[in-house]
């Protein structure tokens, strides 16, 4: 078991806080990439649908097949964003856990006294 002391806990809290700050950028970038891929898929689908011959129900399937690469790119961008978001939430939970450990250690140090007689 690891011995916790206030200095190590503060270092851990600072490290997690820095990771959270970096995850904001990662989440933002991933979401922007998802929105771009989603828009590209919508536009490609609309063009494919309009250019497909035949009845409406057939156009839908033709458009789906014609835009499979755009759909795949959108799905990958969506998964990337969701992963970044879950990572940010996990870091937030880790920060709260370290704060709880810090409170326990401070309480333990406070209960030990200051060496007064």
Where are these regions (language model features)?
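Short, charge-rich amphipathic alpha-helices with coiled-coil/heptad character
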Residues: 1-24
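Short, glycine/alanine-rich amphipathic alpha-helical segment
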Residues: 51-80
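Acidic, low-complexity, intrinsically disordered peripheral segments
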Residues: 102-117
């Amino acid at each position: 078991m690891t011995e916790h002391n206030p200095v190590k806990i503060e270092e851990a809290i600072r490290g997690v806080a820095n990771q959270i700050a970096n995850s904001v950028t990662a989440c933002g970038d991933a979401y922007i990439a998802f929105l771009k891929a989603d828009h590209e898929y919508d536009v490609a689908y609309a063009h494919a649908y309009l250019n497909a011959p035949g009845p409406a129900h057939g156009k839908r399937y033709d458009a789906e097949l014609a835009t499979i690469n755009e759909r795949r790119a959108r799905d990958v961008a969506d998964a990337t964003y969701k992963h970044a978001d879950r990572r940010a939430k996990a870091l937030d939970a880790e920060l709260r856990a370290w704060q709880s450990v810090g409170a326990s250690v401070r309480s333990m140090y406070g209960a030990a006294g200051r060496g007064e007689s």
